[in-house]
Curated annotation (Swiss-Prot):
Assembly and oligomerization: Homodimer.
GO BP terms, alphabetized: chaperone cofactor-dependent protein refolding; DNA replication; protein refolding; response to heat
Cofactor: how and how many bound: Binds 2 Zn(2+) ions per monomer.
Organism of provenance: Stenotrophomonas maltophilia (strain R551-3)
Comment, domains: The J domain is necessary and sufficient to stimulate DnaK ATPase activity. Zinc center 1 plays an important role in the autonomous, DnaK-independent chaperone activity of DnaJ. Zinc center 2 is essential for interaction with DnaK and for DnaJ activity.
This protein's encoding gene: dnaJ
Similarity comment: Belongs to the DnaJ family.
Transmembrane among keywords: no
UniProt-annotated stretches for the region Disordered: 223-242
Gene Ontology cellular component list: cytoplasm
Cofactor field: Zn(2+)
Protein name: Chaperone protein DnaJ
Amino acid sequence: MSKRDYYEVLGVARTANDEELKKAYRRCAMKFHPDRNPGDAAAEASFKECKEAYEVLSDGNKRRMYDSHGHAAFEHGMGGGGGPGGPDMNDIFGDIFGNIFGGAGGGGPRQARRGADIGYVMELDLEEAVRGVERRIEIPTLAECGDCDGSGSEDGKVETCNVCHGRGQVRIQRGIFAMQQACHNCGGRGQIIAKPCKTCHGNGRVEEDKVLSVKVPAGVDTGDRIRLSGEGEAGPAGTPPGDLYVEVRVREHAIFQRDGDDLHCEVPIRISQAALGDTVRVATLGGEAEIRIPAETQTGKLFRLRGKGVRSVRSRSEGDLYCRVVVETPVNLTNDQRKLLEQFEATFNGEDARKHSPKSATFIDGVKGFWDRMTS
């Protein structure tokens, strides 16, 4: 029977990146894992197919070979058949199949397994990220079966597999090639459970919603990860559990924009404040602070408040707060206010206007020069 396309096996596009491949492989492996499907030959075959596909597509060189030549890239004769200048096909098969089934191509001992790592995304408000917070989270996971203490055996007894003799692998000879593959008798575990636990059906693990308390340190930012060692899935047959990785995502804030340990905000001021100068109050993480606005301040001027940013989670130094002034045009004017502004505008005439609005005058001169050059 011809092999299925590796991308089809994992259910991803041919343009899938490393993260998409990893997620697809995890879904596939969880669905067909022998520990979850004891005695199911079809599931075991699908599991091996998933691992083989991921082994090739997750390796840059093998993926390029596969994209160029398909499955033929790993068949006898491709690349010179192991002769000078070409890859040793026995090494290629040993690399692929050995890594897939937990051993080296030379038939080394079965590697110890552990539980899978779990990822969790925690969304925080800026205030929580800056000050730190303790959160209770609930995650679905595979926990050690309490009835058999994770052994999978009702009476706690296991027997050494009489096919692989405890190695979990068998050596298959196909022509001139020797390959390692998981033992069909024990599913790669190296042991046989005579009396499977009725609760976990010999798996040693049960599905469970675990509740944990996670302490988030002050100063974290989007993309930071917190590792909780041993809080991942329980390992099969009493092997060590995996880890839990909590990834932080900080929500957008109504006032502040964060850039590392610095904060940025906009401070609206009136035309009169910008022209005459004033003192305005601004919000900071620690309360209010004052900024002195000098006379003739223009939109876009930055004011720096040292140490009013975020305390770094790594160095414990503090960032700064940058306040950008925005001169706000007044709206909803009363008749008296409109008349005053009209009187004020009437004072700008001729060369006198250039003195009071230098940027506007420079812009007008630039436009005039442009049209003079265009029409000359």
